[in-house]
Curated annotation (Swiss-Prot):
Induction: Up-regulated by phorbol myristate acetate (PMA). Residues 37-279 form the Peptidase S1 domain. This is Serine protease 33. GO terms for cellular component: cytoplasm; extracellular space.
Length: 280
């Protein structure tokens, strides 16, 4: 489902049961429709209310996540160097991109902020903060996801969800009538993931392919993954009853290939940078 190489509320810090506290409000990370996605299945209305579609001149280019009423987090590589914020809009509250509804929102982007360590090859700092032209009203279909505490990361094996409107497989785009897709993927140890990417690659073992600031999720045998069009979208994990934005879809080799799990930008690594700029 990966792109080409995806009102005011008071948010409080609360302690999580396992020490994975995050920036939360009464609404963040708690959809009114409970998730039933186990692997590669259709989403339901209001199931992932933070899911955003980043659109360039009306066309979907990447996914994103609402983290505050006026802020969306996505991937930096979704924005070419000379891209103008005024050419982009963020669509929220949608289940299918091919249909319109008065319950969905389409908001212009005011500005795009990139981390200071972002590299254009996407290897580092592949995040973009989008400030919307105006705050959006929150509802059952539009809610923010929770942010992780700086440096906190769930352990390997934690089951998480990646969602998006990206391709079903390489070269097979999601039909416009199909709803938002989601798949369950476990977090992988970073060294294990880096080792998998060295399999069949002409890269010395001592040279890191998956760099610090990234994390991996998926299966060594493949089968389940993000794909073209999902870049910038959310990798969320359920922690203490709330969904937390653990990763942002960044890059991978193909889609769901063996030894090539999805690579995500670690949101916890950049939480201080995010929180210093976002008005919650």
């Amino acid at each position: 489902m990966r792109g080409v190489s995806c009102l005011q509320v008071l948010l409080l810090l609360v302690l999580g049961a396992a020490g994975t506290q995050g920036r939360k409000s009464a609404a963040c990370g708690q959809p009114r429709m409970s998730s039933r996605i186990v692997g590669g299945r259709d989403g339901r209305d209001g199931e992932w209310p933070w899911q955003a579609s980043i659109q360039h001149r009306g066309a979907h280019v990447c996914g994103g996540s609402l983290i505050a009423p006026q802020w969306v987090l996505t991937a930096a590589h979704c924005f070419p160097r000379r891209a103008l914020p005024a050419e982009y809009r963020v669509r929220l509250g949608a289940l299918r991109l091919g249909s319109t509804s008065p319950r969905t929102l389409s908001v212009p982007v005011r500005r795009v902020l990139l981390p200071p360590d972002y590299s254009e090859d996407g290897a580092r700092g592949d995040l973009a903060l989008l400030q919307l032209r105006r705050p959006v009203p929150l509802s059952a279909r539009v809610q923010p996801v929770c942010l992780p505490v700086p440096g906190a990361r769930p352990p390997p094996g934690t089951p998480c969800r990646v969602t998006g409107w990206g391709s079903l497989r390489p070269g097979v785009p999601l039909p416009e009538w199909r709803p938002l897709q989601g798949v369950r993927v476990p977090l992988l140890d970073s060294r294990t993931c880096d080792g998998l990417y060295h399999v069949g690659a002409d890269v010395p073992q001592a040279e890191r392919i998956v760099l610090p600031g990234s994390l991996c999720a998926g299966y060594p045998q493949g089968h389940k993954d993000a794909c073209q069009g999902d870049s910038g979208g959310p990798l969320t994990c359920l922690q203490s009853g709330s969904w937390v934005l653990v990763g942002v879809v960044s890059w991978g080799k193909g889609c769901a290939l063996p030894n090539r799990p999805g690579v995500y930008t670690s949101v916890a690594t950049y939480s201080p940078w995010i929180q210093a700029r976002v008005s919650f």
